[in-house]
């Protein structure tokens, strides 16, 4: 083997190793935390119609510090930042776009445990670019930094992230956020775009599922960078994304939502968007649809009508818990009741659904316990694979009015075309037959000629 052949072999070997690494699946374990200090509902009463100025008939909030069911969890990823490897536990959040931690001098009403000290990292650099983020559970602001981040053990990458000078963040036992939404004002600062830039994946694809992991005994969830083999199976389904003004969330078009058990199924048709948010531990419904849910829960034995026409919501046992059913694209996704309800400290089950004033549905961690969900920023689609307790029922695709018109028009043109072809073919055959027919008197003419 000559020298050039050796160099070629070495080059091919390095290329194949690099290609296999880039295309391989990277696993990041996720760890659950109990969500405290967030209002939960027990013995809910709501007037109909809802009057926010009427304290007597409004919503009653209580603090359920002991609540700890499957649905009542958020999930953390462990990372290290800086030359000294300062450790942080960050909430995985597909509802925002940037990674941020608190500065060591961070002020505000926050419960951040670990804070970043730029002075102890020789590689930290303040970019001077300001950021301001708002969440349902708080807000933060500060400046973007550039430093090494280790989210894969023993591998560091130079990345941008936010360092908060002020944080009003009410979720306990965490140090910040890993934002994984599709886009932001500057793509260079989006975490998932930085993953691709550093060659960790050959496309803007990652997936999330919340269940016990064999490779990490204390983890109860995992994030995969790259496309997992689940999504090549026949049970997996794809749904196109929809885009919202100003900012792109991971969202699809919701066509209906309802509750069901073995004997009863109640649902309503909607035309709105459904946002998938790993940073939310509940199912959030628009207010006008939440009232429908309150009515339906009484039909399942999970509530009663009050004298003021409000509703008192409770579930006495696990047997009475209805399933939540979401329909988007042409698929019904069923979340079992044990994931859609909390068990309160007083022994009653509380629906994990809450309401907000806007017209958008937000589905949180209950969904990811039963569906392995893939976020594909390259093809602008979401993919879902049912886990142990998840059910996907696929129906026929709903066609738009324009598509129906085209199909009907095309069908008419096709039928008319076939009819014309048959007509002219028959006509041509008849004309040909008429030319080949011998007249009855032709023998008499010839006889007279030779006579």
Language model feature labels by segment:
Residues 77-81, 133, 145-154, 208-210, ...:
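Short conserved beta-strand and strand-loop elements enriched in small hydrophobics
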């Amino acid at each position: 083997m000559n020298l050039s052949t050796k160099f070629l072999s070495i080059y091919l070997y390095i290329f194949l190793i690099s290609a296999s690494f880039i295309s391989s699946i990277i696993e990041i374990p996720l760890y659950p935390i109990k969500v405290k200090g967030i209002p939960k509902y027990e013995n809910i009463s709501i007037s109909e119609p809802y009057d926010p100025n009427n304290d007597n008939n409004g919503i009653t909030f209580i603090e359920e510090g002991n609540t700890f069911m499957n649905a009542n969890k958020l999930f953390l990823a462990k990372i290290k930042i800086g030359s000294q490897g300062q450790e942080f536990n960050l909430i995985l959040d597909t509802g925002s776009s940037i990674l941020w931690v608190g500065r060591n001098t961070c002020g505000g009403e926050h419960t951040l445990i670990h804070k970043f000290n730029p002075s102890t990292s020789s590689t930290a650099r303040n970019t001077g670019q300001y950021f301001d983020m708002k969440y349902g559970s708080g807000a933060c602001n500060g400046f973007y930094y550039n430093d090494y981040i280790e989210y894969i053990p023993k591998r560091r990458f130079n990345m941008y992230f936010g360092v908060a000078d002020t944080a009003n963040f009410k979720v306990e036992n965490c140090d910040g956020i890993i934002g994984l939404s599709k886009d932001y004002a500057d793509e260079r600062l989006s975490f998932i775009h930085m993953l691709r830039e550093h060659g960790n994946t050959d496309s803007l694809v990652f997936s999330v599922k919340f269940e016990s992991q064999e490779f990490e005994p204390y983890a109860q969830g995992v994030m995969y960078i790259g496309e997992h083999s689940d999504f090549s199976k026949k049970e997996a389904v794809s749904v196109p994304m929809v885009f919202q003004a100003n900012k792109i969330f991971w969202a699809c078009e919701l066509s209906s939502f309802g509750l069901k058990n073995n004997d009863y199924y109640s649902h309503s048709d909607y035309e709105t968007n459904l946002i998938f948010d790993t940073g939310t531990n509940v199912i959030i419904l628009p207010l006008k649809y939440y009232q429908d849910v309150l009515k339906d829960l009484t039909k399942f034995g999970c509530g009663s009508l009050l004298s003021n026409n409000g509703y008192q919501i409770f579930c006495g046992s696990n047997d009475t818990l209805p399933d939540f059913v979401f329909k988007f694209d042409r698929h019904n996704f069923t979340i079992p009741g044990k994931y859609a309800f909390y068990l309160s400290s007083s022994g009653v089950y509380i629906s994990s659904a809450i309401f907000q004033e806007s017209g958008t549905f937000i589905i949180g961690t209950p969904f990811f316990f039963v569906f392995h969900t893939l976020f594909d920023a390259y093809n602008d689609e979401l993919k879902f694979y049912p886990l142990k307790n998840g059910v996907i029922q696929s129906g026929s695709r709903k066609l738009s009015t324009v598509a129906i018109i085209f199909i009907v028009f095309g069908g008419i043109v096709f039928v008319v075309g076939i009819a014309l072809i048959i007509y002219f073919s028959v006509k041509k055959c008849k004309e040909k037959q008429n030319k080949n027919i011998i007249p009855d008197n032709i023998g008499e003419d010839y006889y007279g000629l030779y006579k």
